[in-house]
Amino acid sequence: MCGIVGAVAQRNVSQILLEGLSRLEYRGYDSAGICTIDNNTLNCIKTTGKVKNLKEAVKEKGCPGSIGIAHTRWATHGIPSEVNAHPHICDNLALVHNGIIENFAEIKEQLIAQGYKFKSQTDTEVLVCLIHYHLQKSSSLLEAFKSALNEVKGSFGLALIDKNDPNTLYAARSGSPLIIGLGIGENFIASDTLALLPVTRRFIFLEEGEIAVLTTESIKVYDLDGNELHKDIVESDMDAESISKGPYRHYMQKEIYEQPQSLQNTLLGRLRGDDISLETVVGIDENTFKDIDSIQIVACGTSYHAGLVGRYWLEALTGISTNVEIASEYRYRKAVVRKNSLFVTISQSGETADTLASLRLAKEQNYKKSLCICNVNGSSLVRESDFTLFTKAGAEIGVASTKAFTTQLLSLLILALIIGKQKGTISKEQNHEIIEDIRKLPALAQEFLDCDKEISLLSEQFSGKHHCLFLGRGVMFPIALEGALKLKEISYIHAEGYAAGELKHGPIALIDKEMPVVVVAPDNSLMDKLVSNIEEVRARGALLYIFVSEQAHLKEDRQTRKVSLPDCPEILQPILFTIPLQLLAYHCAVINGTDVDQPRNLAKSVTVE
């Protein structure tokens, strides 16, 4: 949510800032702005809508300067408008801000009493005025910056410039991610490494409560008490070209088709004969999980659905009681924590606000250890967890998660095998069989992609539909939830996922001849039960779309469309049956003409609570 880019250089920085914003569009936003300093003057341009609107405005008006900040805004305080867009200016200062200042109304009243006037409805304008207020009483802008930040409550990632000091860029982080990019004779700040890949591969990750001061020749990082800190430099191996669409129409389409390779990357170097390398999970040894007797998984959105699938595998393969909870709910109940409990978080970005807050809460509770399943090395979740299992999905730009989800599932299966082996709950024969099945996964994923053309044609039947029901049983119930989420978030068709056994407990009342019902029906031990649910739907005249294994024998009639999918090992079914549901959502969105990669009101990384 929101994006920040800042630069201090010996060249014009406006194109660097605009390119950085373009690379952050996937995070979700409703307006954008840029501010540079030229001849001790603040040049500020703001627009609503897409970054391309800002680029056109900059091209028309010009925005010179060798130092500047830029921002994409997601409305929290105040409607989307040019007035509310960032940067916000107070006299000589310009500020961009990600996060929420919780006590802004109280501070605003105090500043109004001091004679400050406000143009916008935002908490960010209040913050820049607060910094300006402290500057009048401080010996330096750095001191004023620290004083203001010690006064505010909430979360923030900030970048600040001063027209009276056109060679220095200030930044601070508390709850909202910020990274520093190191160049030669130039330095940068951003909310995501992707924004800076065209200009640097060397990064410093700011931690909670840290302030950075950047010039062309130096970077200094302080805590809020003013103590200078030593920071490690991290070299990124990500390729700037890896985030191009290539021959694909949308990032989502590309990322769906990348799944065979992404799954292969998740396995790379981790399978050794019938064993999984201990190096798969960073930080563990052969005894790490021996005493674990309960597992708590916490995640949001699609990652939560991955956790629900993971529970089936963890309990079946390890015998350990596993609970899964939405992060924003976990934080607000008094959890009963057993002595030898493992706390597991799942997040693609590693910056999801509620998931991070849950991890920090867990550290105050009685958990033995914490483990994160994450796609981004160096993210806050990775740095703050005891152990990490990297999904290695590669950059995912589309807001709707695809390859990140399937690699999360594979990572959870791998984790279950590692814990099961340490606990002695998996026989050698079972371990061998599962690992042999896992080796087939990338090739099977490619086979499942071969149904794309059929699903593209099928999706035309969803045109004009306003509601849809997804049904699944057992481990496929979370996949039904995920299928419904994908459809609703990118095609804007209202969709709900239900456990098929719950059909008679409410959702059957909604079924009529106009409602598509999607059934996830792999050939497994629950097929007979699922067939009964299918017949109940059929009897009420609904439009049935059944995603089924080739070897399963289900009848097809005028109201039923069957999509036959390749046979696959039962333990891999949740991963593989996800792929056709992703394709269905994608093609429905294309037909409906929605913004597939940046659906309305959604953000890739939810970094505010």
Predicted feature residues:
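Glycine-rich oxoanion-binding loops at beta->alpha junctions
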Residues: 49, 66-83, 274-286, 310-346, ...
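Conserved short alpha-helical segments that host acidic/polar catalytic motifs at enzyme active sites
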Residues: 1-245, 249, 264-293, 332, ...
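Active-site phosphate/pyrophosphate-binding segments
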Residues: 259-263, 267-296, 377, 387-516, ...
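Acidic/histidine-rich
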Residues: 152-186, 463-489, 524, 531
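Glycine-rich phosphate-binding loops that contact phosphosugars or nucleotide phosphates
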Residues: 290-440, 520-525, 529-566, 584
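Short, glycine-/Ser/Thr-/acidic-enriched flexible segments
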Residues: 9-13, 39-41, 49-50, 74-76, ...
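Generic C-terminus detector
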Residues: 226, 558, 568-609
